[in-house]
Amino acid sequence: MKIAVLLSGGVDSSVALYRIINKGYTSIKCYYLKIWLEDELSYIGSCPWQEDLNYVEAVCSKFNVPYEIINFQKEYYNKVVSYTIKELKNGNTPSPDIFCNQRIKFGAFFEKINEQYDLVVTGHYAKIQTKDKKFFLKQAKDKIKDQSYFLSHLSQKQMSKLYFPLGTLLKSEVRQIAKNINLPNKNRKDSQGICFLGKIKYNEFIKYHLGEKKGNIIEKETGKIIGTHNGYWFFTVGQRRGIKLSNGPWFVIEKDLEKNIIYISHNENYSKQAKRKFLVHEIHWINGTPSDFENFKIKIRHGEKKYSCKLKLIAKNLIEISLNKKDYGISPGQFAIFYKNTECLGGAKIFKVME
């Protein structure tokens, strides 16, 4: 069996490689996908990809496995970054990492290797199970690290080639394995934030592409102007960090795109702006449309929290979702990801928040 392993330079993908080797497979080649935008934005921050590559080289040397670098910066910009910029300009809250997996790691990369390999291995925290020649995406053992949210838009064809060796492990167990076998990157910290930015701050990326435009910050309850901001595209509904005003905490509860106004509220009044009903479209089902929508739960952001909900099919590509509890940060552009027990069924894009 010929196996391709996607190495990032981090601990997770390195332990995934080790576990495949430990199973006795020998026909293995590693790939590092270069998608960072920091060549373009090098004046903003330091470039991590050389550091990543140093760790990739060290890990491959330890296990005597060949590796290759593939540059996907152009594809990434066209398929993921341009979408992110467009969503921000439209006042939405994008989820670029979902498309990173669908369109680049398991899209452009699969096209590049063109059926050369029987299996592609990564360090994602998720599980793929097979039944009756169909593939099912399941949550990882580690519910905190679980990445099924970001893998929710995979196709059956993509899943047929994938294996996630870390799906049955806790992060603490992965760290311990790295120490036990003395991996070169055993003490490296986990990466944070959006995958294509590296060490670039998100707001610097936004500023580079969309610029700045002064606008007012208004307290929702009083209508009083209590500050200014540099553009609505820097803010998302539910945001608390980065408002930088005294007498907090403050939360972003509404955006007026036409007037470039950010509305904020104190925590004690914030619940009045919470919503529970919204519409989603651009629906993707991993195993086709379910026969019923009973006992569904959804996530509206990466993390452990799931909501019980009711789903109502309005049209072929339109679903109304009603949560059992209100949420403070539902925003157009986010993705609602569907679950039944531990199975991830797919997801859809939020485009209208109702009540």
From Swiss-Prot:
Reaction catalysed? S-sulfanyl-L-cysteinyl-[protein] + uridine(34) in tRNA + AH2 + ATP = 2-thiouridine(34) in tRNA + L-cysteinyl-[protein] + A + AMP + diphosphate + H(+)
Keywords in alphabetical order, please: ATP-binding, Cytoplasm, Disulfide bond, Nucleotide-binding, RNA-binding, Transferase, tRNA processing, tRNA-binding
Locations listed in the record: Cytoplasm
Cystine connections: C100-C195
Which NCBIfam families does this chain map to? PRK00143.1, trmU
Family matches, as PANTHER family: PTHR43052, TRNA-5-TAURINOMETHYLURIDINE 2-SULFURTRANSFERASE (PTHR43052:SF1)
Q: Please give the chief subcellular localization of this protein.
A: cytoplasm
Give the record's family classification. Answer: Belongs to the MnmA/TRMU family.
* Site residues by UniProt (Interaction with tRNA): H124, Q334
- Tell me where the transmembrane regions lie: none
Q: What does this protein do?
A: Catalyzes the 2-thiolation of uridine at the wobble position (U34) of tRNA, leading to the formation of s(2)U34.
Q: Give the EC number(s) listed in the UniProt record.
A: 2.8.1.13
Q: Which HAMAP family has this protein been placed in?
A: tRNA_thiouridyl_MnmA
UniProt name for this protein: tRNA-specific 2-thiouridylase MnmA
Q: Where is the segment annotated Interaction with tRNA?
A: 145-147
Recorded GO CC terms: cytoplasm
Where ATP binds, per the record, is at: L6, L7, S8, G9, G10, V11, D12, S13, L33, G123
Q: Which GO terms describe its molecular function?
A: ATP binding; tRNA binding; tRNA-uridine 2-sulfurtransferase activity
Catalytic residue positions: C100 (nucleophile), C195 (cysteine persulfide intermediate)
One BP annotation, GO: tRNA modification
